[in-house]
Amino acid sequence: MSIEVSNESGMDVSEEELISVARFVIARMDVHPAAELSMVLVDSATMADLHMRWMDLPGPTDVMSFPMDELEPGGRPDSPEPGPSMLGDIVLCPSFAADQAEKAGHPLAHELALLTVHGVLHLLGYDHAEPEEEKEMFGLQNQLLDDWYEDLRRAERDAALAARDQKLLGKAGFFDAPDQ
């Protein structure tokens, strides 16, 4: 799976975290492992221009998705040709997201993770134009985000336990203990 991030926003953002959440969602949604995704982070002026050009709406927005193929919700972008399948592009506006995060009372990193999940779901054919679609998409979005956070917590726990075990086994003489 190839995920490329281009940060043109002028804001310091953890690209690794965006890649992590996008990779998690793509894998969880059973998309072909050779799929490709492009993410671009832009400033408010660029996002406002894209928003007007593609949605005919004034002002910036938080996230826009540009799928390569029109899919049904849950559809799989499996290319008949060998090689990777391009899902599309996700455009994020960190400055707009920062304002939303402040209003919601959570960190910018959480808002960007949420928007990344949202963007990937749009690429996979999900939408929220109708109430039933919104219920399905937002429910799935929240579940995927919760699952990703749980996965991160589990990985941190496992790493802490492994470090503790290595230290204890080193003291018992099973192998060299790391420097303390």
From Swiss-Prot:
Where is the protein found, in the record's own terms?
Answer: Cytoplasm
Please give the Pfam families that the UniProt record associates with this protein.
Answer: YbeY
Top-rank taxon? Bacteria
Keyword Nucleotidyltransferase found = no
Where does this chain mainly localize? cytoplasm
An example GO BP is: rRNA processing
UniProtKB keywords: Cytoplasm, Endonuclease, Hydrolase, Metal-binding, Nuclease, Ribosome biogenesis, rRNA processing, Zinc
What Gene Ontology terms describe what this protein does at the molecular function level? Answer: metalloendopeptidase activity; RNA endonuclease activity; zinc ion binding
Q: How is the cofactor bound?
A: Binds 1 zinc ion.
Q: Which cofactor does it need?
A: Zn(2+)
Query: What EC identifiers does the entry list?
Result: 3.1.-.-
Gene Ontology cellular component annotations, sorted alphabetically: cytoplasm
Q: Which residues bind Zn(2+)?
A: H118, H122, H128
Whether Nuclease counts among this entry's keywords is yes
Q: Which family does it belong to?
A: Belongs to the endoribonuclease YbeY family.
Summary of the function given for this chain in its UniProt record:
Single strand-specific metallo-endoribonuclease involved in late-stage 70S ribosome quality control and in maturation of the 3' terminus of the 16S rRNA.
Which PANTHER family does this entry report, sorted A to Z? ENDORIBONUCLEASE YBEY, CHLOROPLASTIC
Q: What is this protein called?
A: Endoribonuclease YbeY
Q: Gene name, please? A: ybeY
